[in-house]
Amino acid sequence: MQLTPEIQEEINQVRQNCGYFFMEGWSILSANGKDTLSFLQTQTTNDALQLQVGQGQSSAITDRQARLITSFSLHRMDENESWLLSDNSKTLHDHLESYHFREDVAFETLNLDLLALQGPKSMLILEKVFSSLPEKPNGIERHDFEGAPLTVIKKSLTGEEGFIICLPSELKENFTQKLVNAETQSTKIGEQAREVLRVEAGIPIFGKDMDGKNILPETGLEHSSVSYNKGCYIGQEVIARIKTYGAPNFALMGVTIEGPISPPMNGSILLGDKKIGIIKSSARSESLDKLIALAYLQKDHRSPDVEMDVSINERPFKIKTCLLPFYQASTRKEHSKKLLNEALQIYKEQENLDNPIAILREAIDIYPKHAEAYEALGVFLAKQDKLDEAIALMKRLTEINPQEIMAHTNLSVYYMKQGRIEDAENEKAEATALQFEQAVEKSMAKKMKKKEAEQRKKEM
């Protein structure tokens, strides 16, 4: 199973930049009324009553045996309305209505298009359109675009930072064009690339990796979608008992597979004559240079990093168990550092500073506290005689971190180049004072540590 160059480029775009796609098959179910949260509290596995306006959570619905009916995310819009985001909306709607009697809550599937932006630069792209964005996973914000309401949900579908824009159909074309113009460098991501990204991120989907035959603790959803402190809901007793007394017999985890042949979906994994698991979604991961798969494994075979020679539907395979996710996204700080290193490498190889400067601006946008990126950008701007901009940059850094010695040192140098002797001397004095204060603090901390060690030695 080899990926085409086009598919791999789409994957790289999401991992390094930003990709977009419309979420066909997904929809928003609105629940509205003064009893909305109290009703959902009795039906769902997570603690709906803890949600504040603008917050969200992953959740699920189970039957009395804790078998999964569906999974979704819940988002509190205002005092009375919440949204349920699901790729199984009809089942979700039908179930809730079947338990809905006198409660003041009305359900409606909204006519909205769902546009996903995924990747480390998705936030930067959306910040050009919206004044603010939700900061926490499943957080939600309402905005206006061309006089019409839009809603933004923070949600990763690929393992990277990502957002979902919920927009009326009439805005679909104009909004998409605004987001994907040449300046944003955002690429449309096809279904095959999305599947690889999803499997690498270890994200199971209902109907493929889990269904009504699975009890919820088998799926891994108990880590994100279950509150063990809330009141009663359907299936709670079984879920709580499994947590208290042991682990499910089978549970979802990752396996890597040697060789070029992908295992069949739902293929039985046999170790000798014993069935120890079942294969679910699989994909070719170029970042790992391996075939990877989600699989339900029997509890005696769920230790990570264990290699096994097995047969899957009577074909021999060599597999290795691993914890999910296969891929761990970089933090904003880590991504900013990569961009800094990229800019410095380009600077070594070419004289033109425009490209490194653009990359460093991007690094600072992604992680505004990255002092080394500020320093490098200030140096490059000074080399282009853009001293006013370099000074403004260092002042911004002193506002972010008043204890940053390097910012005051550079300001002193830049002021001196402009002939602003008094300002230069003041910044030099500030840098010297900070350096002295930090040296004193370091010395005192060292003495305190030594004193504590001596005290512990006396007490022995």
Q: What is the predicted function of each stretch?
A:
Residues 1-69, 76:
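Acidic, proline/glycine-enriched N-terminal capping motif
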Residues 64-68, 72, 214, 219-226, ...:
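Glycine-rich, small/acidic residue-mixed loop/short-helix segments
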Residues 2-11, 104-252, 256, 325, ...:
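Glycine-rich, acidic
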Residues 332-366:
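Alpha-helical segment of the N-proximal tetratricopeptide repeat
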Residues 349-361, 384-396, 418-432, 451-457:
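Structural signature of tandem alpha-helical TPR/SEL1-like repeats
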